[in-house]
Amino acid sequence: MEIRAEEISEIIRKQIKEYGTEVAVAETGTIISIGDGIARIHGLDKAMAGELLEFPGGISGMVLNLEEDNVGAAILGEFSEIKEGDTVKRTGKIVEVPVGEALIGRVVNALGQPIDGKGPINTDKFGKVEVKAPGIVQRKSVHQPMQTGLKAIDSMVPIGRGQRELIIGDRQTGKTAVAIDTIINQKGGDVVCIYVAIGQKRSTVAQVVSKLQEHGAMDYTIIVAATASEPAPLQFISPYTGVTMGEYFRDSGKHALIIYDDLSKQAVAYRQLSLLLRRPPGREAYPGDVFYLHSRLLERACKVSDACGAGSLTALPIIETQAGDVSAYIPTNVISITDGQIYLESDLFYSGVRPAINVGLSVSRVGGSAQVKAMKQVAGTLRLSLAQYREMAAFAQFGSDLDKATQMQLARGERLVEILKQPQYKPVPNEKQVLIIFAANNGFIDDYPVSALRRYETELYTFFDTRKADVLADLRDKKAIDDDIKGKIVAALNEFKKEFTA
């Protein structure tokens, strides 16, 4: 067989022509040590702070420390398979998570990946986990109400859209209950809710999901879960994942509500990361930038100016205290960042006052300007009346000889405390809250025993729903009590008084 030179050269030419010239270039480094979700990597000289890294097995990591001869990275996922000497690639991207309408009704992990077994999330939109909060020019003062459906909050500690209101209290005082009721109360409205569970038991998260489904609230809610069994880096990043999803709605001119449950556990996870990264510890072994950890997160919740779409992102961070100590390190940090706090007290909770809000220590610094006018009219003196009642009740324990005025004030105070109680998962619309507080302030409930007031309230709502729906509609539309509406309410309450028997 004869081999001709032309044929050989033709074959070589053809192969050169068809040769693929694409060469994938990636900057890689080598793991020099790994443990507890932290890897030290040599060779990634050009890595950026917060950059996404690619570990073997498709696991992601995030650069946190940039040192002279190595970088410290948090591994965002299961790290048991990763070992010393493995190769790590740079991606050149900052950590991103999926955002958009497709996430509504889903349960996702701290990286935005679905964990509810309902298949993949179809979205092509992504948002950076760490972005700068809107500047002063892009903001507007809070002026629209964010109704929680809880009488004690909407009347005395009102929350506005774009506000950051802290919910603080010991364990088992109903902090999550307040947050879940607020989500349920947004049903039929235009608010998208995001619930971020940080370091909680999986059973607790499952319970929250089933309660929200039961009340039809998952139709407008996203749940981000970094449970107790997940590595510290995921617990640390989950609030930022949640707020990134919320910012998408805020910047689209919509309204969103985000709940962080709770930020104490995020601070603990961040402390663990920082100590493993050998950053110097400060007070209570927290790193020096633990204030910035929370401030940069909460500053991203705001009311945006009309020029930027007039959207809003309202934040309800939760902080757990130890034995009611509000002056500990993390609680004081978050109190100073937020626009007010709702303080829940275990003594009140165990004495049957639920929601267990301590009116004296709870405050809303900007919500007053967002409160519905009708509520402002009826609830203006409520806080003062309750404070006077508490003071009077303390004195009344010492002596039994009380004059008639004092006895009346004590009786009125007892009734006010009773009508502000509310069962869980039963938010009350604003116009009905106005009715019951109006009735209490104007002496319509003074003649009834305290034990009959729960029934009085239920029957009053039914009476107005069935026979005085026009009064409720007027209150809902006008959002204020003028002489005409006041006359109608008084007449209706007098009519109801004749029918109601204690």
UniProtKB/Swiss-Prot annotation:
Protein name: ATP synthase subunit alpha
Top-rank taxon, per record: Bacteria
Membrane-protein topology: Peripheral membrane protein
Family under the similarity heading: Belongs to the ATPase alpha/beta chains family.
Keywords: ATP synthesis, ATP-binding, Cell inner membrane, Cell membrane, CF(1), Hydrogen ion transport, Ion transport, Membrane, Nucleotide-binding, Translocase, Transport
UniProt site positions, description: Required for activity: S362
Enzyme class: translocase
EC number: 7.1.2.2
Subcellular location as annotated: Cell inner membrane
Catalytic activity: ATP + H2O + 4 H(+)(in) = ADP + phosphate + 5 H(+)(out)
InterPro entries on file: ATP_synth_asu-like_sf, ATP_synth_asu_C, ATP_synth_asu_C_sf, ATP_synth_F1_a_nt-bd_dom, ATP_synth_F1_asu, ATPase_a/bsu_AS, ATPase_F1/V1/A1_a/bsu_N, ATPase_F1/V1/A1_a/bsu_N_sf
Binding site for ATP: G169, D170, R171, Q172, T173, G174, K175, T176
Subunit structure: F-type ATPases have 2 components, CF(1) - the catalytic core - and CF(0) - the membrane proton channel. CF(1) has five subunits: alpha(3), beta(3), gamma(1), delta(1), epsilon(1). CF(0) has three main subunits: a(1), b(2) and c(9-12). The alpha and beta chains form an alternating ring which encloses part of the gamma chain. CF(1) is attached to CF(0) by a central stalk formed by the gamma and epsilon chains, while a peripheral stalk is formed by the delta and b chains.
Gene Ontology MF annotations: ADP binding; ATP binding; proton-transporting ATP synthase activity, rotational mechanism
Family annotation (Pfam families): ATP-synt_ab (PF00006), ATP-synt_ab_C (PF00306), ATP-synt_ab_N (PF02874)
A cellular-component GO term for this protein: proton-transporting ATP synthase complex
Function: Produces ATP from ADP in the presence of a proton gradient across the membrane. The alpha chain is a regulatory subunit.
